[in-house]
């Protein structure tokens, strides 16, 4: 009786492939949401909802409730979109899948900041570069030398490649478009409440752990993809693999060390968060050319990951 609903929520392989292509094209054409599109974006609405549910003095149980309430309410909206579009027309259903892909995997937006910041640095506009990078990282970059500014930029690119593209793509293959959205929402909630502050330490625990769990395998797969794709960006596969083996566990984060060390080794640069960690410490700080190369490396790794994802979708169709 509900077989149609299963096909609507987890489409056939050809629809998954077409939806992925549509979503990536939408991302290239319209990378940054503004106005009403931004206000209705699930990353924005879930972030606001989670913060509004925070209660002073609440513990881990309420933190789990924040995650469940926020995730389930958003998933219901997009599940309804998939179901309704499926009943109307196959083309509309494919478009709905593509829209969810676009909302869940903002690849171009993740890359643009690093490219712009590196170009500003190349032009000698260090303060402009600093302001751009400050917009994507939490650490205070005021007074930091350009090398540490570009380090923060490359680190953010490496982490965002996992959080914003390869991880949701992994769950897209496994669970369909709602799987990609689940990962993106979970990552957003970690960014909203997953902090070790007196107010959020207990309430954010569940969101932080959920994000760590969901990204555990994709982070490691992505590090391997970065190493394999390194020659496409003029970087070093061997250097990347060596740095992963040597430095991936230096960070407090269970996952972030893998893509960051993969980038550091591939580019042969020192990536540092002052007072917290130094990755590939024997190498020089990155310059603007390294920032541009990091963007090319991210594109190369994402492209390789996408090709393998498409192959997995095709093999799934053949198995079916």
Swiss-Prot record:
Keywords assigned: Cell membrane, Cobalamin biosynthesis, Membrane, Transmembrane, Transmembrane helix
Superkingdom of origin organism: Archaea
GO cellular component: plasma membrane
Pathway: Cofactor biosynthesis; adenosylcobalamin biosynthesis
Gene Ontology biological process terms, A to Z: cobalamin biosynthetic process
Primary site of residence: membrane
Compartments, record wording: Cell membrane
Keyword Membrane: yes
Xref: InterPro entries: Cobalamin_biosynth_CobD/CbiB
Keyword Transmembrane: yes
Mode of membrane association: Multi-pass membrane protein
Protein name: Probable cobalamin biosynthesis protein CobD
Gene: cobD
């Amino acid at each position: 009786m509900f077989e149609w609903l299963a096909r609507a929520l987890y489409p056939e392989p050809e629809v998954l492939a077409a939806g992925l292509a549509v979503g990536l094209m939408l991302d290239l054409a319209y990378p940054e949401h503004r106005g009403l599109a931004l206000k209705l974006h699930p990353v924005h609405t879930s972030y606001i909802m989670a913060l509004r549910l925070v209660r002073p003095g609440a513990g881990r149980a309420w933190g789990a409730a924040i995650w469940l309430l926020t995730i389930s309410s958003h998933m219901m909206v997009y599940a309804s979109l998939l179901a309704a579009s499926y009943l109307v027309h196959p083309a509309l259903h494919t478009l709905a899948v593509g829209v969810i892909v676009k909302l869940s995997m903002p690849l171009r937006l993740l890359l643009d900041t690093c490219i712009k910041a590196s170009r500003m640095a190349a032009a000698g506009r260090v303060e402009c570069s600093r302001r751009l990078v400050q917009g994507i990282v939490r650490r205070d970059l005021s007074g930091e030398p350009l090398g540490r500014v570009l380090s923060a930029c490359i680190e953010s690119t490496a982490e965002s490649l996992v959080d914003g593209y390869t991880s949701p793509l992994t769950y897209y293959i496994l669970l369909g478009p709602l799987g990609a959205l689940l990962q993106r929402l979970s990552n957003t909630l970690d960014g909203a409440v997953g902090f070790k502050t007196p107010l959020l330490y207990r309430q954010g625990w569940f969101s932080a752990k959920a994000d760590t769990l969901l990204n555990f395998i994709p982070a490691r797969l992505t590090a391997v993809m970065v190493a394999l794709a390194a020659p496409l960006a003029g970087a070093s596969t061997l250097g990347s693999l060596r740095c992963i083996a040597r430095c991936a566990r230096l960070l407090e984060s269970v996952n972030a060390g893998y893509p960051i060390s993969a980038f550091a080794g591939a580019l042969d640069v020192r990536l540092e968060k002052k007072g917290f960690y130094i990755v590939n410490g024997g190498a020089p700080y990155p310059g603007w050319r390294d920032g541009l190369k990091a963007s090319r490396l991210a594109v190369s790794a994402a492209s390789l990951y996408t090709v393998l994802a498409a192959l997995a979708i095709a093999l799934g169709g053949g198995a079916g």
